[in-house]
Amino acid sequence: MLKSKYSDGFFSIDKENGFLPLAEPLRQLPEAYTDLQTLIDQMPIEREDGSKGLLHTEGAFEKAVLQIENHLEQVKSEKDPFVRAALFRAYSFVCSAYTLAPAHHHFIANGTYGKAHRTVPKNIAQPFAEVADQLGQFPFLDYHYSYSLGNYYKINPDGGFNWENLGMAAKFSGMSDERGFIMLHVDINQYSPQLIEGSMGIVHAQDDEEMNHHLELVGTALKHMNARRRLMWEASRWKHYNDFRVFIMGVKGNTDIFDEGLIYEGVWDEPKAFRGQTGAQDNIIPTADIISGVVDFYPENQLTQYLMDLRQYRPVCVQDFLKDLKESSTGSAGTIARLKASNNQKGLQLLLKILEEIYLFRNGHWQFVQKYIMSNTAYPKATGGTPITSWIPNQIKAVLSAMTTVDQLTEDGAHGFDKKEWKVRFEKKVQLLNKQLEIVQVPSFNPEDVFKLNAALGLNDA
């Protein structure tokens, strides 16, 4: 049964907070962890005062990490959810920076990712595994507590959540492109309360009027999110993505960097392989996919299994919310089925608008991949370990399938709906994806050829 609130004390998934934390995350660790906080402050390639940090010099960060006290016993005693979240963030950054520093420096020297360190030192591994267990998370850099949603502070405390007003509490490169890239994700989530309210309202709607009101709320929220998402092109220059990308790589799916896994000294004897930080761990599209019915059109293949695997890399309260939302929106309780049963033509058109925004979000993300990743490196895996040329297209196909089904239920002319005009725009979407997938099947394809098709078919995101 869908509840009105899902909380772990740091996040509270409800119509007031959406997917953002209950309050601004701690920017600094408590005094008991001064040495760890100092390491975080000295870590970035470029520090806030313009000086070069530890990651700028090969081997310097690893040497500094070994001097940090093992705070295992202190971490065990922490009860405050915000302190736990800040500790998880700190140890996540140290773990990823330590293990991936060699890969970064190899890329700087040779243009390809080198091998990572395969062992996390005991003084980091033990307290990291402890706080991860407290939060119900894997001990590796994640999207929620570590890199994005739990890593912001407001530059102007009285200002809003626009990315220009957000700084990063912890950072790898320390450069403006890293800040713009990840803080824009926080920015987009400022509209998640409306998405939650609308989604919960759809589940509980008792008639067409209530249903349509909440469908409109979801569509409006997604439209705002897409408008903010498109600012990525100016917030973070695509040519600078590699300044920090290697540090958010995961172990699972990236054997070229990590071989068979990562050893956590004093925790596990066998190597572990966790997925890396990725925007695919965000909750906006999973929520929209469930409430719109797109989830029922996911292809049954390995790529969809990757998507399901990523669901584990979320706070437990988010996992519970998505699970309950799905269980409340299946079969005859699904949005498409309910709209069909009542022949709610206005609602079907509102659902098509939601599907349009989901498509634009995914296709915009696909265009980010084409420029930020494919144009920057020949490395075939995303930070989460998924194959970059097929991962998002797999999800776009699901959206297109859902669109086709909903269109078949709409009546031409109802509430001014023009089926012919809609189909023309829809066929352009299909044509674009098919042509792009043809290109990426060719060995040594030119990423620019893939990207140019977006403008050629009038679907350019930039």
Set out the residue ranges of the language-model regions.
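Surface-exposed peri-terminal alpha-helical interaction modules
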Residues: 1-462
